[in-house]
Amino acid sequence: MEVVPAEVNSLLPEEIMDTGITLVDDDSIEAVIVSSPIPMETELEEIVNINSTGDSTATPISTEPITVYSNHTNQVAVNTTITKADSNTTVKPAFPSGLQKLGAQTPVTISANQIILNKVSQTSDLKLGNQTLKPDGQKLILTTLGKSGSPIVLALPHSQLPQAQKVTTQAQSGDAKLPPQQIKVVTIGGRPEVKPVIGVSALTPGSQLINTTTQPSVLQTQQLKTVQIAKKPRTPTSGPVITKLIFAKPINSKAVTGQTTQVSPPVIAGRVLSQSTPGTPSKTITISESGVIGSTLNSTTQTPNKIAISPLKSPNKAVKSTVQTITVGGVSTSQFKTIIPLATAPNVQQIQVPGSKFHYVRLVTATSASSSTQPVSQNPSTNTQPLQQAKPVVVNTTPVRMSVPIVSAQAVKQVVPKPINPTSQIVTTSQPQQRLIMPATPLPQIQPNLTNLPPGTVLAPAPGTGNVGYAVLPAQYVTQLQQSSYVSIASNSTFTGTSGIQTQARLPFNGIIPSESASRPRKPCNCTKSLCLKLYCDCFANGEFCNNCNCTNCYNNLEHENERQKAIKACLDRNPEAFKPKIGKGKEGESDRRHSKGCNCKRSGCLKNYCECYEAKIMCSSICKCIGCKNFEESPERKTLMHLADAAEVRVQQQTAAKTKLSSQISDLLTRPTPALNSGGGKLPFTFVTKEVAEATCNCLLAQAEQADKKGKSKAAAERMILEEFGRCLMSVINSAGKAKSDPCAMNC
């Protein structure tokens, strides 16, 4: 695809703006098929004579009707006339005096590269005008669709009019032979009573208006080619439509027959020319001899595409109340492959392993009476669990028990093995089918490591086979064990398991029972005489029951609900807002909290917890009725008390942190391993403090005391001498420990 020349796109807005013709939405234009020559009418400011100095010959042209369908409301009939003109022929414009001056119609501003198509009211003797069309590709752009009576403008690009600027200066003598020239004539209908229009005109700066038309005498041997473009009804939401007609010209100058037309490189079939007018859809039609090559409608309104999404296959939910029965010999292999070794009708032996959450089942044959079976395990493992005396296993977790039927049999034997007692208890039930109970986990995780268990406790194969077949099934939850109930493996009343739940004691976490993990929002009350049914009980005032409080003879609990309800009713009768929060936000614009009713303190100065404002750590407001209040911002007493309160709170926090740190250190000391008694092979110093060393040290201390007594030392001096002697003895012990590696120490006092 080649790009449309930029000069065509740059000319479109000017041509559209220069026409000055608006579109009417309700115009109903009919298609007019022209099969005979039709006279043409020209609009001229003055009468101009047309004379041609050169003889021109018109070649026969064959045309054929073509019907094109599009989405516009207007219908356009295009008549194409093909002629071949020599590029060297120069035609001088001259107007015969027989033309009549027409009445002035709607004035139209026309640029130098536009062609006007006008209606013809009567026949006139018009010859070929001064426009010589080059055979290198013409582009006639229909810039508007007007009403009946208004001129139709077809614009030619400026590059297509090289000879229009120099027309009336040169004249050549001799016969001028006109090869077939391709001239596109557009006939456009307005309303139903409009007359068809034929003609293409080019405007030059040196002439007013020159129309090229066909006369009956000239076009007797020509056939007009009619292109009928049928339109669909206009939609009410569509805006003005500008139609662009792009006519293709042959690339070379060869004679063109009536049936063949080549598209020149500047004009691409189906190429949509850009349009500068926003919001106006454009209709581009490329017309050639073979018909409409491309027709494209561009509109700014885009409809979102709806993409149909194919529904995904939802997973099938198969809820089965009864277990499936897999019949031997008729197993369908549509989803799973089942390998079942069956020499004879096997029975199922149930195995209970203490401490295991999986239920194991052993397959044994009915004919084998001996308990010596061949152990099968593909992965040798030494992690075995010896069986103890059989007892009901209490399941704390919630494993999934998968029931898979293997084959139907007349009787099902469930055996609970007891290694201590060789005899096993056999329970015969009346179930019509066997069930293999296994957890719904992948196969490598559920293979039991029971290699070294006694006979009768492993998965035994059928005679003649070396493997045990597992039924590969999807993990459907058939039976799920809950903590609230325990289902016994045996299905008969002969073997009954204890239905119980091993409950773990709720251990307090950080000294708080889990049910009471929610921290208390306020401190406990200390009521003694009010029965906790007065508003000065914090628990009662906040609508809560007393819990772990220090109150005595408390009625604020569920046991005394009647008295509690009576007290609540009495408080509400006195004050309907008694149980509402006393500390709330201030008025509009006040961000500080304040008491909703105000305090009534008289002797405390509002600096004790009796004052509700001070207790809430807010200052008294103007609604308080207190006397001698010191709970205001600039009060020195309040600042001192607040500082003391803050200091006390900080002290409590520090004590709590110290207790927590001390407890953590003690726990670390308890859990810290005991240090080794030997260091590097030598003895530690305290190992030298034996009974003999202690006796010698005491003798040394007594000797120092006697010496101080003889010298008459004071009591303080005597104690000092004794302590110095004790220190010397300890240093001797330590030094002896340091020399223990080299030579044995000798204690000297």
UniProtKB/Swiss-Prot annotation:
Pfam families: TCR. Zn(2+) 5 binds at C599, C613, C620, C624. Keywords: Acetylation, Activator, Cell cycle, DNA-binding, Isopeptide bond, Metal-binding, Nucleus, Phosphoprotein, Repressor, Transcription, Transcription regulation, Ubl conjugation, Zinc. The record marks Y536, Y610 as: Critical for interaction with target DNA. It is found in: Nucleus. Residues 523-536, 599-612 are annotated as: DNA-binding. Residues 521-634 form the CRC domain. There is a cross-link at K139, K357, K639, K659, K661 (Glycyl lysine isopeptide (Lys-Gly) (interchain with G-Cter in SUMO2)). Coiled coil: none annotated. The record marks R574 as: Interaction with DNA. The modification Phosphoserine is found at S264, S282, S310, S314, S635. InterPro entries: CRC, Lin-54_fam, Tesmin/TSO1-like_CXC. Zn(2+) 4 binds at C599, C601, C606, C611. Zn(2+) 6 binds at C606, C620, C626, C629. It comes from the Eukaryota. GO terms for biological process: nucleosome organization; regulation of DNA-templated transcription. Component of the DREAM complex (also named LINC complex) at least composed of E2F4, E2F5, LIN9, LIN37, LIN52, LIN54, MYBL1, MYBL2, RBL1, RBL2, RBBP4, TFDP1 and TFDP2. The complex exists in quiescent cells where it represses cell cycle-dependent genes. It dissociates in S phase when LIN9, LIN37, LIN52 and LIN54 form a subcomplex that binds to MYBL2. Component of the DREAM complex, a multiprotein complex that can both act as a transcription activator or repressor depending on the context. In G0 phase, the complex binds to more than 800 promoters and is required for repression of E2F target genes. In S phase, the complex selectively binds to the promoters of G2/M genes whose products are required for mitosis and participates in their cell cycle dependent activation. In the complex, acts as a DNA-binding protein that binds the promoter of CDK1 in a sequence-specific manner. This is Protein lin-54 homolog. It comes from Homo sapiens. The lineage of its organism: Eukaryota, Metazoa, Chordata, Craniata, Vertebrata. The gene is LIN54.
